Each structure stands twice: as structure tokens, then as C-alpha cells.
């Protein structure tokens, strides 16, 4: 119909009419009442404005005559004007700073002015209605429907503007905090998914390493107790070696094929998960430093440079890793420990996984770490600790004795077997220094080989 509007002749009164807005809903009724009160005869003035139909369109004379009557109706220019306003309001950007007196050309605020100007110009030249009352009613209803449509479009625009304003305000107030929280949640979920498959295999390797140490007569004692500097250094060496082994095992995924890995990578990219290379670097560092999985500030900076992440992301990753990698390994080893003895980082040998001196990992500080109960050592001027490096524990040759060893209560003062536990091999009780109590002999007698074969 827009093409037909362009092909039509210019209607008198439509040229030069300001395209303002629209007014209230009662204007149409007022216009109709005003027009009915006119005494001017209904004539055929509208026939002068009829547009000739293109050839081939009106084979039926009746249809052609009806179209000509609609196009030549005095209210048809107003109908075309309202229709154009609806099109502009639908597909054109709104401009509140328009040059028209009533504001935006697509607005409904100046509808009264539009109607008044049109009625004034038309009344001076011809009547507002034709000789066909049915056609007059059709034109008025069509104008009202388009005007209601224009009002609804304006409501939609107002709702859109209100929603956009509130949405932008909400984003400005919450976006910084929400981004940090979402980043942490995403990294936590990614760490959990990445490490679920590796925890079980690492725990199995840990158990096999424990059995290997038991069979080969490792220098690590299965008896819970304090550790010396020499044993701590050996434990650190074993930790690094086993960490390398674990790093190699983690570097080669054991489950899934290449297609699954590609799909996982695509899914991780969509979720904003850390790159696989970055997680592998941090995992390798974690497994190589299981005895103390707490990187220093310099190490965090270096890891951040190596992985391309921020220091905060590296720090959060290690917090999650200590909770979701190290602790499940300890729990899994407790459930699958050999000989029915519960696995504990306080006493049982875990092949380099002991977190030395870490209070928040549930491990007691150096001293009598493996002593159960509420035993409190007697005051002494010398620090408590393991025997010096170089001593070999007196452990039964049987593998069960290697794992469990004698009860630590035997080393406590007052126990029936206390004297025999602190004597050297082949020595009798009278060889002890009489000036020292059994507790002093245990704590201060460093020159007594209590583990001699």
C-alpha cells in the first residue's frame, strides 16, 4: 500500500500540514460529531481526487469503483498519514529532539493538533464525509485502529527504555563483583573436573610406592613418631622423585580419546576455564612440592608468568587443589591402607606426601607427632625431635612389623616395656645411667643407640 500512497496525487490540505503527534482517544468521536453538525451538502468532490487504476488490476467494475471511492474519500489522507506514522514508529529510531512543534513525528502527544489542522484545512474546501455512510464508518474505524496501534507502539518503546535503563544501572552496580565470583566459581568447577580422574590413579600409585618401600626395607619407619633432619631430607628427595613420576602420569591422560578431549576443550573455552597448559604447569608444581604445597610470593609470580594467569588466579587454584587433590589422596589412602591399619599423615609413611609442619592440613608440628591421647612431654631444655640422621630403626624383619612397628606407648615413662624399648641391643637395664630417669634417657640421651640392630 505504501507504493500506492506514493503514486497518489497530493491531496489538498495534506501538503504543508505539520506532522506532529496524536492526541486523546475521544478526538475521533468529536471529529465525527463536529462533521455531522455541518450543513454542507455531501457532494462528489472526492471524485476529483481519484487515482486511475493501473491496467489489469480492475477487471471487475464493482471492485474498481469501491477502490476509487476509498482512495477518493476525504478522510483517506488522514488515514495514510496515521499509517505512515505507525511505520515510522516501528522501523525508525526515535528522536525526542525533533524540529516539529509537537515533538517527535512518531509520538502520540500531538494527535489532537494533527486532527485539528487536518479538519480545519479540509472543512474549508470540502466536507469530511462522502455520500456513503458505510464507507465513512469504515474510514473512521480504520483511523482509530491505527491510532490505537500507534499508542501501543509508544507503550512498547517506553517499556523498552525503562528496561534498558534499569538493566544498565544493575550492570554498573554489580558487574565488577559478579565477574570475580563467576571467575572463581568457574575455576573451582574446572579444577574439580580436571582432577577427578587423576586422584584415583595417584592414590593407587601412592599405595604401590608404600608397598615398594616396605619390601625393600626403606629407612622410613612405620612407627608414628618425630622425625629428624636426615629423614626429613630423605623424605624431601623421595617427594621430588615421586612428584616427577606423578607429573608424568598426569601429563598423559589415561581415559577418553582425542574427540572427547577436543569436545572438553571447546566446552572449557565456552565456560572460560583455565587453559590445559596452565593447569598442567600448576599441577606439576603441586606434585613436586607435596611436602609443602604452599608456593611463596615469588613462586606465585613465576607461576603466573609461566601460565599467563594472574597471581590471584594462581592463588585460588592452589587453594582448591590442596582441598580437592591432596586431601582426597590422604582420604583414599586411609580407606585402602595395608594391614587394616588406618592411614594418617601423622604416623604412616606416605611416600613423600607428608605435609611437614602444616597445621591446617591436620598434621601435628614436629615433636611427638604420633603420640595419641593427651600425653604431654615432660619439660626439657633440649628440643624434642627424631634421633639424629644415620640411626636405623629397630624394626622386626617381618613386613607387618615394618608397617606397624612397636606401639609408641612403649616409649612412654611408666610403661612396663619402657625400659626394654630404650635399651641398646644386647644391653641390660643396669647399663643405663642411674642419674637419668627413663624419660630423660629418651629425650636427652642422644648417645644411646635405641635402634641398634
Swiss-Prot record:
Region Disordered: what ranges? 33-64, 192-272
**Ranges of Polar residues compositional bias?**
197-209, 231-242
Q: Which UniProt keywords apply?
A: Activator, Developmental protein, Differentiation, DNA-binding, Homeobox, Neurogenesis, Nucleus, Transcription, Transcription regulation
* CC terms in the record's Gene Ontology section: cytoplasm; nucleus
* Encoding gene per record: meis3
In this chain the MEIS N-terminal domain maps to 102-185
Q: Where is the composition biased (Low complexity)?
A: 218-230
Protein name per its UniProtKB record: Homeobox protein meis3
Amino acid at each position: 500500500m505504501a507504493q500506492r500512497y506514493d503514486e497518489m496525487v497530493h491531496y489538498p490540505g495534506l501538503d504543508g500540514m505539520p506532522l506532529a503527534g496524536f492526541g486523546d482517544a475521544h478526538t475521533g468521536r468529536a471529529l465525527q460529531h463536529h462533521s455531522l453538525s455541518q450543513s454542507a451538502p455531501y457532494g462528489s468532490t472526492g471524485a476529483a481526487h481519484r487515482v486511475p487504476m493501473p491496467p489489469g488490476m480492475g477487471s471487475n467494475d464493482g471492485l474498481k469503483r469501491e477502490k476509487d471511492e476509498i482512495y477518493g474519500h476525504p478522510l483517506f489522507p488522514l488515514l495514510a498519514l496515521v499509517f505512515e506514522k505507525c511505520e515510522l514508529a516501528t522501523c525508525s529510531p526515535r528522536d525526542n529532539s525533533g524540529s516539529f512543534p509537537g515533538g517527535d513525528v512518531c509520538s502520540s502527544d500531538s494527535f489532537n493538533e494533527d486532527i485539528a489542522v487536518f479538519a480545519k484545512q479540509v472543512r474549508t474546501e470540502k466536507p469530511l464525509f462522502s455520500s456513503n455512510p458505510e464507507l465513512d464508518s469504515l474510514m473512521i474505524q480504520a483511523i482509530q485502529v491505527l491510532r490505537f496501534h500507534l499508542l501501543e507502539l509508544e507503550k512498547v518503546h517506553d517499556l523498552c527504555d525503562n528496561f534498558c535503563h534499569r538493566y544498565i544501572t544493575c550492570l554498573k552496580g554489580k558487574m565488577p563483583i559478579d565477574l570475580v565470583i563467576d571467575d572463581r566459581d568457574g575455576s573451582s568447577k574446572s579444577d574439580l573436573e580436571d582432577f577427578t580422574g587423576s586422584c584415583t590413579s595417584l592414590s593407587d600409585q601412592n599405595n604401590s610406592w608404600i608397598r615398594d618401600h616396605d619390601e625393600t626395607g626403606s629407612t622410613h619407619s612405620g612407627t608414628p613418631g618425630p622425625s629428624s633432619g636426615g629423614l626429613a631430607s630423605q623424605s624431601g628427595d623421595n617427594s621430588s622423585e615421586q612428584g616427577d613420576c606423578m607429573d608424568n602420569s598426569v601429563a598423559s591422560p589415561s581415559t577418553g580419546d582425542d574427540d572427547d578431549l577436543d569436545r572438553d576443550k571447546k566446552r572449557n573455552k565456552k565456560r572460560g576455564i583455565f587453559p590445559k597448559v596452565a593447569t598442567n604447569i600448576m599441577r606439576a608444581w603441586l606434585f613436586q612440592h607435596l611436602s609443602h604445597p604452599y608456593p611463596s610470593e615469588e613462586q606465585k609470580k613465576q607461576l603466573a608468568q609461566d601460565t599467563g594467569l594472574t597471581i590471584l588466579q594462581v592463588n585460588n587454584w592452589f587453594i582448591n587443589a590442596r582441598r580437592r587433590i591432596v586431601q582426597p589422596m590422604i582420604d583414599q589412602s586411609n580407606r585402602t591402607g595395608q594391614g587394616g591399619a588406618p592411614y594418617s599423615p601423622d604416623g604412616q609413611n606416605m611416600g613423600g606426601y607428608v605435609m611437614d609442619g602444616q597445621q591446617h592440613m591436620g598434621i601435628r608440628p614436629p615433636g611427638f607427632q604420633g603420640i595419641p591421647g593427651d600425653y604431654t612431654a615432660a619439660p626439657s631444655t633440649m628440643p624434642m625431635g627424631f634421633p639424629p640422621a644415620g640411626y636405623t630403626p629397630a624394626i622386626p624383619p617381618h613386613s607387618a612389623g615394618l608397617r606397624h612397628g612397636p606401639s609408641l606407648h612403649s616409649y612412654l615413662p611408666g610403661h612396663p616395656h619402657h625400659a626394654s624399648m630404650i635399651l641398646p641391643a644386647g644391653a641390660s637395664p643396669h647399663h643405663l645411667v642411674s642419674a637419668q630417669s627413663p624419660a630423660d634417657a629418651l629425650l636427652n640421651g642422644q648417645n644411646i643407640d635405641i635402634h641398634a640392630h
